[in-house]
Amino acid sequence: MLISVCIPTYNRPKSLLNCLNSLSLQTDLDFEVCISDNCSHENIERIIDPYRKKLNIKFNKNKENLGAALNFLKVASMAKSEFIWFLGDDDLLFPNAIKELKSLININKDCDFFWINS
C-alpha cells in the first residue's frame, strides 16, 4: 500500500462522517485510513463502523485527551504505508484525489514529501 490517510479527530462526528464519505467515494480505494480519536465524548467508532466494509480502517481511541500534537503523532504512528496524507476530520476530497496523488508520486519518484493545500 502506498498511501495512509491519517485523521486525528475530537468530538466532531458529523465532520468525520462527511470526511469518511468522501474517502469512500474515491475512484482508487487502495489506501488505508488511520483515525485517532482524542478521547471524544461522542461515540466516534459508531460513525466509523459502516465504512469498514469499503475502507481499510485502523481506529484508535485514546484513554485520555493527549492534546492535538500528541494525537497527531499517534495517528501517524498507526500508518504502515510509504506516504502519509494528513487530513482534518472536516476535510473533503474530490473522488479522484487518491488516484491523482498516486500519479504525482509515480511521476516524481525522487520526492519524499508533497504539500497539498486546497
Regions found by a protein language model. Name each.
Residues 1-118:
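Nucleotide-sugar donor-binding/catalytic module of glycosyltransferases
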